[in-house]
């Protein structure tokens, strides 16, 4: 009888998720608490930093979006984060809080718009490459690209992405659905051939010009020279006295941290990392 009761409860929980999303009651309660608490913050609060810090010490777990091999579902998981889902959750919370929204459904809808091209929940529309993530979220009016022809943006990235289509076995859902491959190739073709100015590793110092360029709470995309990829890691900018640090879901520390090392020193330990691109959350209150 007890086993049957548990089974019924589990089924109820699954159906309560709806047809398009996975989440737990804990996730829903946490999101609504965070959004309610944010309404009490001073108006000039840096919401990206505030919400990012609410996830400090949350465990790093990869592949949390690939729960259903049959079809893509919107996953809300605040208990386990990777570098991308950390940034997406923080951005979604920030945009909701700016609009004064406090309901989980508001957050869920915003996260869907951030994570998927044109907000359509499909594996081939998930913004797997962060270059396309930036382009799409800028087009949607959620972020602005921070770039310039001048210092410290002294280098240019020529994007050539095909890692997913060339390494299908590394992606469980894609390997299970070879019919999705053409959609992934189409996604890769959108950004392949594009050029973007970026801040090279050597320019990521504690200078006045860098402090003027990068603001607390900016989204930092670390670029890579690894063949077929555009970026290797993302996080949120945090300025401290000794320089620029990265708040991120770290596979090294196995949790969300503000990296103790300054970003330049961190990147020097990763020879394949060549520099950074930036985007900044739009201030909806000014629009």
Predicted regions mapped to residue ranges:
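Bacterial N-terminal signal peptides
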Residues: 7-16
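Bacterial Sec-dependent signal peptides at the C-terminal "C-region" and cleavage site
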Residues: 17-26
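Bacterial N-terminal signal peptides that target proteins for export
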Residues: 1-7
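Sequence/structural signature of beta-propeller domains
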Residues: 45-56
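Short alpha-helix capping/helix-loop boundary micro-motifs
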Residues: 198-210, 224
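Acidic/His-rich structured neighborhood in mature extracellular/periplasmic domains
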Residues: 60-197, 239, 247-251
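C-terminal soluble interaction/assembly domains
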Residues: 215-287
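Start-of-domain marker
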Residues: 27-46, 65
